């Protein structure tokens, strides 16, 4: 397979295939000063008790896992995709050589109404979670800090809408990695989204979002989007 010249869109590098319409577009994210291509995004659901409570759900007996494909990576924050979308801000981990090499922050966009219907029917969530453009990321930085000391903030139009600490997770980053590796191969540059704290809500057209990854009151990485 051959690719044309890579095109930068925000923090995402997109390779367009040489045969338009016949080959897929492979999407990449930024890790330090490199562009890397995740093969998959592994997502953890129901990992903060406060979020479970706001969704009127029950604490699961086992870790909840679902997937997003590479095609879910996007740069544009959309308010609508067949139905209104909801934001969920998450601490994100980047895998390399079997270890957590990078950390960032991201948005897991969700078709909440569809997700509710799928849950009620006992069906998988992917149709409401894994659509194109449903995963937005900041630049990833080296994981040189204690992962349990990470926190996130999501600001919308200057108001703090979400805040969460890794210490409040039901499954810590290390526990997530160990549990996943019991049944799943984590390849180089795969991304793990570790779940969202309370405060999720609908995306409004024109709203300005800033997601921050924080350690010891220092901002490690951030990303800005204006919803369309």
List PLM regions with ranges.
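Glycine-rich anion-binding loop/nest that anchors nucleotide
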Residues: 195
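Catalytic-core "active-site belt" of small-molecule-metabolizing enzymes
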Residues: 4-191, 199-228
């Amino acid at each position: 397979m051959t690719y044309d010249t890579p095109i930068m869109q925000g923090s995402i590098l997109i390779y367009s295939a040489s045969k338009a319409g016949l080959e897929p577009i492979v999407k990449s994210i930024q890790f330090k000063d490199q562009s890397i291509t995740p093969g998959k995004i592994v997502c953890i659901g129901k990992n903060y008790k406060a979020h479970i409570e706001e969704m009127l759900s029950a604490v699961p007996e086992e870790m909840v896992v679902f997937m997003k494909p590479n095609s879910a990576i996007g740069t544009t924050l959309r308010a609508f995709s067949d139905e209104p979308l909801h934001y969920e801000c998450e601490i994100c981990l980047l895998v390399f050589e079997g270890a957590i090499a990078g950390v960032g922050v991201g948005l897991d966009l969700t078709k909440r109404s569809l997700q509710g219907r799928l849950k009620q029917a006992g069906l998988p969530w992917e149709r409401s979670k894994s659509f194109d453009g449903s995963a937005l990321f900041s630049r990833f930085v080296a994981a040189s800090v204690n992962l349990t000391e990470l926190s996130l903030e999501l600001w919308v139009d200057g108001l703090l809408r979400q805040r969460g600490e890794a210490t409040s997770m039901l499954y810590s980053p290390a526990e997530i990695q160990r549990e996943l590796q019991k049944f799943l191969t984590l390849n180089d540059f795969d991304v793990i989204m570790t779940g969202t704290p309370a405060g999720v809500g609908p995306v409004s057209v024109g709203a300005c979002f800033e997601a921050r990854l924080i350690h010891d009151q220092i901002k490690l990485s951030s990303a800005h989007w204006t919803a369309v």
